[in-house]
């Protein structure tokens, strides 16, 4: 009996344990197709590989970044057989920096990928196709980003200051001295920033840096302890040379080094200027933001005698232009400080037919007085989680038209199911190319109450 027992193989409950592939391992793969996020998909020995930097039909060597169960995440290290679609990336850091994921894909193909992602989500989740597909709303491929956070970390062991952007799927910092997606006003600042910070006498106190471009250019430094005078003088001279405001973020809220300095951006078609502060949300792509507002107003088409509700209104990015067309605008935002700034923005732009309210829009709206007033149209611009609680009650507002601006096609499709159940019809939809060179999809959808 014992002789036979030695030949038996016992396995724990749950089946055979999957052998994990170690990070760093290189593997030759044939890419079958692209995933929704722009990565190549390959299949090998029962595992599905998601390979950044690859294209359908290519044969590549991929380095494993992470493996879990039957899913392997990897990065292209070498291309043996290239797709005819492949192009040279505009940035030398592409493939290492985590900021851009599809620079190797022509822009028209990037737009087609995003359009397909939106269409597939709407069809699969909501079983709906819009009555009309709008052309993609896009702008410049490069030099579009007016805001960026630069990672800074002191390596005490190596006595080295790392300055750059986070690596893909990692907390590592890729040292970077230029970034082609930044607007031109920020390019020379980014070029010289690493060298300037590395000359600090006390680099240990440095946190991240934020760069802003708008009505004014600004540099914000997060620091964990007080700056010594020599380092502060170095920073002030750097900002002065680049014509930039300096903001410091130690304890408490960020503050300008020169009292009275403010940040803001223009919406030229409506002769509006919106003030904001570090920490506030603004769209990073100024030209596509303007085009997005123009398209939203065209689609929603508010009349002079209509009341419009703007939910998740932020600083008034949509509400203020809407106020120039509608009789009355009610704008609602969850962050109290942004509600305060939005109200100030309305006053400074001499708009008196828009009112701002603070509310938790993840909760039912039935208790809010402003929700019971009745509206002709509603505009939604929610975060990635979507607006499910809002759309569940949207019919109670009386709105026959609803414009949904989405930064996540999955939650847009989920919310579309509820809107269609309430009797709304998806009249028009299209993508907004807010982040060229990435697979990130923003979208706009117009729903109208069925007659």
From Swiss-Prot:
S-adenosyl-L-methionine binds at residues 283, 312, 317, 333, 360, 381. It holds the Pfam family TRAM. InterPro entries: 23S_rRNA_MeTrfase_RlmD, MeTrfase_TrmA_AS, MeTrfase_TrmA_CS, NA-bd_OB-fold, SAM-dependent_MTases_sf, TRAM_dom, U5_MeTrfase_fam. SUPFAM superfamilies: Nucleic acid-binding proteins, S-adenosyl-L-methionine-dependent methyltransferases. [4Fe-4S] cluster binds at residues 91, 97, 100, 179. The active site is at 407 (nucleophile). Keywords: 4Fe-4S, Iron, Iron-sulfur, Metal-binding, Methyltransferase, rRNA processing, S-adenosyl-L-methionine, Transferase. It catalyses: uridine(1939) in 23S rRNA + S-adenosyl-L-methionine = 5-methyluridine(1939) in 23S rRNA + S-adenosyl-L-homocysteine + H(+). Residues 20-78 form the TRAM domain. It is an enzyme of class 2 (transferase). Belongs to the class I-like SAM-binding methyltransferase superfamily. RNA M5U methyltransferase family. RlmD subfamily. Catalyzes the formation of 5-methyl-uridine at position 1939 (m5U1939) in 23S rRNA. This is 23S rRNA (uracil(1939)-C(5))-methyltransferase RlmD.
């Amino acid at each position: 009996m014992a002789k036979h027992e030695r030949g038996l193989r016992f396995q724990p409950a749950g089946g055979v344990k999957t052998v994990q592939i170690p990070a760093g391992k290189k593997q030759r793969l044939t890419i079958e197709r692209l995933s929704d996020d722009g990565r190549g998909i390959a299949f090998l020995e029962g595992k599905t590989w998601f390979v950044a930097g690859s294209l359908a039909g290519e044969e590549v060597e991929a380095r494993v970044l992470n493996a879990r169960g039957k899913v392997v995440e990897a990065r292209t290290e070498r291309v043996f057989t290239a797709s005819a679609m492949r192009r040279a990336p505009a940035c030398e850091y592409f493939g290492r920096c985590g900021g851009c994921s599809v620079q190797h894909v022509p822009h028209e193909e990037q737009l087609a990928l995003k359009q397909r992602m939106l269409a597939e989500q709407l069809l699969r989740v909501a079983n709906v196709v819009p009555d009309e597909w709008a052309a993609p709303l896009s702008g410049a491929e490069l030099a579009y980003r007016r805001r960026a956070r630069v990672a800074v970390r002191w390596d005490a062991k190596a006595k080295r200051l790392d300055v750059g952007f986070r690596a893909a799927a990692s907390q590592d910092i890729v040292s970077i001295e230029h970034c082609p997606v930044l607007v031109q006003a920020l390019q020379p600042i980014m070029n010289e920033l690493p060298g300037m910070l590395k000359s600090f006498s006390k680099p240990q106190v440095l946190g991240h840096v934020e760069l802003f471009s708008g009505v004014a250019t600004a540099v914000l430094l997060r620091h964990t302890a007080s700056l010594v005078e020599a380092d502060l003088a170095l920073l002030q001279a750097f900002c002065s040379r680049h014509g930039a405001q300096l903001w410091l973020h130690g304890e408490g809220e960020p503050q300008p080094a020169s009292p009275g300095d403010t940040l803001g951006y223009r919406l030229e078609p409506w002769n509006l200027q919106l003030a904001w502060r570090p920490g506030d949300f603004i769209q990073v792509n100024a030209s596509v933001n303007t085009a997005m507002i123009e398209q939203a107003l065209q689609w929603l088409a508010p009349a002079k005698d209509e009341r419009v509700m703007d939910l998740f209104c932020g600083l008034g990015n949509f509400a203020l232009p809407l106020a120039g067309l509608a009789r009355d605008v009610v704008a609602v935002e969850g962050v109290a400080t942004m509600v305060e700034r939005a109200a100030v923005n309305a006053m400074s732009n001499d708009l008196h037919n828009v009112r701002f309210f603070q509310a938790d829009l993840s909760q039912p709206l039935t208790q809010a007085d402003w929700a019971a007033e009745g509206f002709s149209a509603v505009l939604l611009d929610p975060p990635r989680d979507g607006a499910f609680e809002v759309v569940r009650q949207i019919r109670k507002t009386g709105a026959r038209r609803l414009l949904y601006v989405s930064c996540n096609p999955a939650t847009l499709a989920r919310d579309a199911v509820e809107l269609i159940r309430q009797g709304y019809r998806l009249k028009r939809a299209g993508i907004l190319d807010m982040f060229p060179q990435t697979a990130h999809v923003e979208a706009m959808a117009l729903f109208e109450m069925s007659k």
